[in-house]
Amino acid sequence: MAIHYETKATNVGGRKGHVYTDDRALDIDIVPPAQADGKATNPEQLFAAGYASCFNGAFDLILKQNKVRDAHPEVTLTVRLEDDPDSESPQLSVSIDATIKNVISQEEAEKYLQMAHEFCPYSKATQGNINVDLNVNVVD
C-alpha cells in the first residue's frame, strides 16, 4: 500500500496540555471544552477542523469530476461529545452541513454529498464508529 502523506503530532499533558506537529505548523495549548478561553483549543475542535477541511476537499473534487462548476462548496462540521449509553466514557457524533450555490438541484447535491462521504478519508475512518449526519443546502 502506497503512503500518500504522513504527519506526526505530539501531545504533552493530555486534555490540559500542549500539542505540536513535527514541523511546528501547529503548536498550541489544549484545554477541556469547559475551560475554553479563546487562546487554546481542544481535541474536538481539532477533529472538526481536520474533518471539515478533508470533507470539503472531497466534496469539491466530486463536484468537479461531475462537471459541476461554480458551486463554491462550504462545509461546517459539528462535533459533539455526548453520553454513550453503552459505556461510562463519552462518545463523539458529527453533523456535516454543506452549502453550495444554486447550480444543481437539491437531489443532485445530496447525491454528490453522499459520494463525497464515501470518498473522504475521515469519513472512511469514522464509518461504523460514530454517528454522522449529512445535510446539504442549495442556496442562491
UniProtKB/Swiss-Prot annotation:
One of its GO terms (biological process) is response to oxidative stress. Gene3D superfamilies: 2.20.25.10, 3.30.300.20. Disulfide bonds: none annotated. Belongs to the OsmC/Ohr family. This is Organic hydroperoxide resistance protein-like.
